[in-house]
Amino acid sequence: MKIDTHQHYWRYQPQDFGWISDSMPVLQRDFAPADCLEPMHAAGITASIAVQARSMEQETDFLLQLASDNPSVLGVVGWTDLRSAQLQERLEHWTQNPALRGFRHIVQDEPDVPGLLSDAAFQRGVAHLQRKGLSYDVLLFGHQLPDAQAFCARRDQHWLVLDHVGKPALRNWGQADVASRWRKDLRALARLPHLMCKLSGLVTETAWSTAKAVSAGDHAAILQCYDEALEAFGPQRLMYGSDWPVCQLAALYGAVAETALQWASSRLSVSEQDAFWSANAVRAYGLTLPSST
């Protein structure tokens, strides 16, 4: 089985998705799991994990219902206010559904990233997730990675998952020190043995707004990032994610998956490919795979 560990689904309402601008018309519609099944299956990928795209409590309920209705969705990474005094009560409700596997907050857009990550209530919230056996997805821009070092080091009781290889600034990749700073900061985080890394979301870190497809130079930079992540994390702490449908701003699902398929087949052994495509996700998210018949 191959698992796509990073997909988003929504019923599009402009007021709920302020990050979807008018320059992104391809995203201004509904997206459901069934909409991605054909390109997934064409790439040999049969299952997904739904990741929050809205910072509101009903997002978790919405995604859990989708998981109940769609067997291909193996798990949900939801959203809740991790600083809330009602966190324990909410988790007791949601964890009755085995599809709930973790949570994410869009830290990258916070006005004070270091302040949030060091906030005592936020720290307690993530610690409570970990005691419940739930993962936490870390979403940051590349220049913010140093801000997460102490936070990730302290939250070591369960898996943390770094989304999008730490979002390297590929649109500025040719500028002095951009790649080297990201590489250094990624390696520092990778020293934490409880941190997984998703090879995901890189096509939209390129200059997609000025191109109809990922350029040869950007494609080479993406492969370089994959190689750097492999060297830093090793094959037992990497997972594939498409970031569909957001990836469609720059590339179709099939192109994103094909890049990962070709990279994995050329860099990883058979057993390491099994880890990359499935086993690592099972460990990080505590997934229960459907029994084969």
Give the ranges of each region predicted by the language model:
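Short, electropositive alpha-helical surface patch
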Residues: 58-74, 155-162, 215-231, 253-265
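Divalent metal-dependent hydrolysis catalytic cores, especially in the metallo-beta-lactamase
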Residues: 21-29, 34-55, 73-81, 101-108, ...
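Active-site gating/metal-coordination segments in enzymes
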Residues: 58-143, 150-152, 166, 202, ...
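Alpha-helical scaffolding within the catalytic cores
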Residues: 32-36, 58-59, 86-89, 146, ...
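Mid-to-C-terminal alpha-helical segments outside catalytic/metal-binding sites
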Residues: 1-5, 26-47, 227-228, 233-239, ...
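Catalytic pocket-lining loop regions of alpha/beta-barrel enzymes
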Residues: 116-239
